[in-house]
Amino acid sequence: EEKAKSQALDLDDMGACLPAKVVIRSGSYEDLDDADILVNAIGRSRKEGETRLDMFGDSMERLKDIIPKIQDTKFRGILISITNPADVVGECLRKALGIERFRCFSTGTSLDSLRIKRILEEKTGYHRNSIEAFCMGEHGDSQIVPLSRVSVGGKPFAKLQKEYPDTLGKITIEDLQDEVRQAGMTVIIGKKSTEFGIGIALSGIVKSIVYDEKRIWPLS
């Protein structure tokens, strides 16, 4: 409770720099009664050499005391889970709380889809905002990059590879998939946890819901 208050106070110090009035405070489970969106971030950081699936037991152990407290509220909003393993934990939460699929989901491969754009920008030199690409499947080691759906400035990437065989033509789907799968661990080895990438992905999803943007996100 004290940590929550301190965290809220620390965040609220930036209030004067925000473009609109935002109330940042700590709260209680009773606040969920009329909440529109609940984000589950319970869990620990992934350890070096550990897969996301290896974290399942610890994640659910931490959630077992939280789930009944949510059940005791009148929460009828949308629950977004970012706890790893994201896809599995999100589904377990949905079943435990008896929430419809459209009201309870994880961030899926949203973060991975941001990462593949960064990787392609580094490899091709094109700005990532001109690159259309996304990851499918599990947020983990089995995710895939559908190369047939990758384009740069509207031009299929496969066509660009044929036009530039000595540069873009040397980029393989295997290399792309391996790099995006290892991206999270690369960050963890250097700083012990991932924060900002998943944070911007989550905020984008929340914004899409609040403003009904009709955007498509690869969730699960």
Task: Please place each PLM-identified region on the residue numbering.
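Rossmann-like NAD(P)(H) cofactor-binding subdomain of soluble oxidoreductases
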Residues: 52-118
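N-terminal glycine-rich phosphate/adenylate-binding segment common to multiple enzyme folds
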Residues: 46-48
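C-terminal substrate-binding/catalytic lobe of Rossmann-fold NAD(P)-dependent dehydrogenases
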Residues: 97-103, 112-220
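Conserved NAD(P)H cofactor-binding loop of Rossmann-fold oxidoreductase domains
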Residues: 42-44
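Redox-cofactor binding/interface segments in oxidoreductases and associated redox assembly factors
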Residues: 38-40, 81
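Conserved N-terminal Rossmann-fold NAD(P) cofactor-binding segment
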Residues: 2-35, 50
